[in-house]
């Protein structure tokens, strides 16, 4: 974040005026200092970012790589892409910093000194580039060429061990100072196994990357490294999609990098194997990197999942069958009233419709002879439910009673955890037909109520406004769903989907208000990382919101888990745990892997398993066992990361706009457990393109 400073001193050009620059250091500490910026210069990669020299406190030279603003060509859409590139680049730089330590001037990668991802133009700060780009370095001595070759492959081997792939290696991103290389273009680094997106130009970008075919492979970068070496040896670019025709004339290059010119990644060696050939005395990258800090916690997930299997637990993404109740469309025609939990069936003699002032008046469907008009009127009609001794009479939308067994979902978490924002974006994504790839179509249960939800929640949030806190209910009020939809699956079965979203303080009550939980079909437990995780980079957010870390877990979780009935050692209601506000952790592994995925990435059972394993490990390490109680209690439970907004709020607005990330994955997991969608098995990351 920047604040205008006192302005330039006498004789300084206007562009060099001082501003106060605020950023986080790689260890999560807030730093504020005066800065002067030079003009935008040539990019250090081919990505959608801007670069300029920067002077901090009149002494520290650095380079600022920043996102383009909304005034850049392409407008808001290009700005979002640019912000996403900075997010991804910073996550990579932080991962390298933590894996390699704070490298000195001889390190193979750019040295990160700070970053700010929630500024209007998010940025990262690096030490100045070392050496010169190799674009015009034809004629280097053979000894130097061998060092460049070894260091390029070594850098790719390090990235591969970290689960990363560099898609931006080209002469302008490789620098050489006579002794060591420095590899820039971190915005072009992606995760192994992620779908390739078209990027780069021939001959340096591999054919599969230029075409956006298949999935990212650590061997992608070897093609680019080989092309860079060919240009250094010959002074000209190589062939775009095959080995250079004169490769045999350059015997040393053909011996070391010949196999790296294979057009398909699957036909190239791995970086580790090639490094062993080029530098047999150098320790493998795996031996030089610190142990994975989450490995032991992932193993804990495996043990916890295995302990549930004797009780009937299924793998993530599989249907759990009768454990979740009767199938949709039970032949009795009865459904459970979501409010009083009494059986109810459609009764044409108990219908009401709203008048001009929204007062419910008796409605006789037999008075409407036109079948089309009757169907439309019934969509807006309500049926009186007499209630019981605890819950007074109330009204249920007619389509809720006439479309099979409803699926009711409750959002669980204390106040300010982001439940309402997450639910709002779930509904918005459904309304945008984001479930269509899974064969699911939708329609509102009650058009007027749905329009009210869109106007009161979706429109303000997508306009960048922070939603008001959910109001608490009075002692005599009944919990009601806030939105309901009709969903039709790929087989043509339709059923209502209804969401409950209560205030956090109401979820702590032990009176009749929470009786709706006795008939609930699915639970979404929302974890707020600012309350759950004592990470340094979250301290500033906690201070702003006057929040504190609670190592004892969310009290709303405990109340709900105690209230929902169970018939054995485990709760059988399908559940999902969601680390919400995950944008606050978007540069943290493993959150960066999942949150940075393209929105079109298909879900599979294997991916659900991998994400659940990662999120369990994250919570186990950084939050503690109390925050994993929903997973330990529920027989069928997956874990997820999601962000409803994509960034932090400021003065009741989201200054960068709003971008939903992974908000539907928890719901899709619940759909899979209920047999509404059938997810493919998928394949492991280490099998990509084999």
Language model: regions and residue ranges:
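ATP-binding glycine-rich loop module of kinase domains
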Residues: 33, 42-101
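Conserved short submotifs of the Hanks-type protein kinase catalytic core
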Residues: 119-132
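Activation segment signature within eukaryotic-like protein kinase domains
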Residues: 148-149
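Catalytic-loop of the protein kinase fold
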Residues: 156-177
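Regulatory extensions appended to serine/threonine kinase catalytic cores
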Residues: 286-319
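A conserved short helix/loop substructure at the end of the activation segment
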Residues: 262-273
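Short beta-strand micro-motifs within the conserved protein kinase catalytic domain, predominantly
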Residues: 111-120
């Amino acid at each position: 974040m920047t604040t205008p400073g006192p302005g330039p001193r006498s004789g300084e050009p206007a562009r060099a005026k001082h501003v106060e620059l605020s950023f986080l250091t790689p260890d999560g500490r807030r730093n504020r200092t005066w800065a002067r910026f030079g003009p935008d210069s040539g990019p250090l990669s081919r990505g959608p970012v801007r670069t300029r020299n920067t002077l901090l406190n009149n002494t520290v030279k650095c380079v600022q790589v920043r996102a383009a603003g909304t005034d850049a060509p392409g407008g808001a859409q290009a700005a979002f892409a640019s912000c996403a590139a900075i997010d991804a680049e910073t996550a990579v730089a932080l991962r390298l910093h933590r894996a390699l330590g704070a490298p000195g001037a001889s390190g193979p990668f750019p040295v990160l000194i700070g970053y700010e991802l929630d500024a209007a133009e998010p940025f990262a700060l690096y030490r100045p580039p070392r050496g010169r780009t190799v674009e015009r370095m034809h004629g280097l001595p053979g000894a130097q060429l061998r060092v460049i070759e070894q260091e390029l492959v070594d850098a790719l081997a390090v990235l591969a061990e970290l689960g990363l792939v560099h898609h931006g290696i080209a002469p302008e991103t490789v620098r050489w100072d006579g002794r060591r290389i420095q590899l820039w273009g971190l915005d072009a680094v992606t995760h192994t196994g992620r779908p390739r997106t078209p990027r780069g130009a021939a001959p340096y970008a591999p054919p599969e990357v230029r075409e956006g075919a298949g999935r990212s492979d650590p061997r992608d970068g070897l093609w680019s490294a080989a092309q860079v070496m060919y240009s250094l040896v010959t002074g000209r670019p190589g062939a775009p999609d095959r080995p250079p025709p004169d490769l045999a004339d350059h015997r040393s290059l053909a011996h070391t990098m010949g196999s790296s010119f294979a057009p398909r990644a699957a036909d190239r060696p791995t970086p580790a194997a090639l490094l062993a050939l080029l530098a047999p005395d150098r320790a493998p990258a795996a031996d030089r990197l610190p142990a994975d800090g989450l490995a032991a916690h992932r193993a804990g997930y495996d043990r916890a999942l295995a302990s549930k299997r004797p009780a009937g637990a299924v793998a993530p993404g599989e249907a759990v069958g009768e454990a979740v109740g009767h199938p949709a469309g039970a032949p009795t025609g009865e459904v459970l009233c979501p409010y009083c939990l009494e059986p109810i069936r459609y009764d044409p003699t108990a219908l009401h419709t709203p008048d001009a002032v929204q007062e419910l008046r008796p409605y006789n469907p037999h008075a409407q002879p036109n079948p089309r008009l009757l169907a439309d009127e019934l969509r807006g009609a309500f049926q009186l439910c007499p209630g019981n001794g605890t819950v007074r009479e109330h009204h249920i939308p007619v389509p809720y009673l006439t479309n099979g067994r409803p699926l009711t979902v409750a959002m669980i978490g204390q106040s300010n955890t982001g439940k309402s924002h997450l639910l709002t974006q779930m509904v918005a994504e459904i309304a945008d037909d984001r479930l269509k790839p899974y064969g699911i179509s939708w329609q509102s249960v009650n058009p007027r109520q749905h329009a009210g939800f869109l106007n009161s929640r979706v429109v303000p949030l997508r306009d960048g406004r922070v939603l008001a806190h959910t109001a608490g209910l009075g002692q005599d009020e009944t919990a009601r769903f806030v939105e309901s939809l009709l969903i039709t699956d790929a087989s043509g079965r339709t059923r209502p989907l209804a969401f409950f979203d209560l205030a956090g303080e109401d979820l702590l009550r032990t009176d009749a208000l929470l009786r709706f939980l006795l008939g609930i079909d699915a639970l979404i437990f929302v974890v707020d990382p600012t309350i759950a995780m004592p990470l340094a980079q979250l301290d500033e957010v906690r201070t702003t919101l006057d929040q504190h870390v609670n190592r004892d877990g969310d009290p709303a979780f405990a109340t709900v888990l105690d209230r929902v009935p169970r018939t054995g050692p485990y709760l059988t209601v399908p559940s999902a745990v969601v680390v919400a506000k995950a944008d606050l952790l978007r540069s943290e592994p493993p959150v960066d892997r999942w949150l940075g995925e393209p929105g079109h990435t298909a879900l599979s059972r294997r991916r659900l398993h991998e994400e659940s394993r990662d999120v369990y490990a994250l919570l186990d390490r950084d939050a503690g066992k109390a925050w994993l109680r929903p997973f330990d209690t529920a027989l069928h439970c997956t874990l997820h990361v999601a962000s409803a907004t994509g960034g932090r709020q400021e003065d009741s607005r989201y200054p960068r706009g709003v971008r939903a990330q992974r908000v539907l994955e928890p719901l899709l997991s619940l759909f899979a457990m209920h047999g509404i969608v059938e997810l493919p098995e998928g394949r492991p990351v280490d099998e990509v393109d084999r």
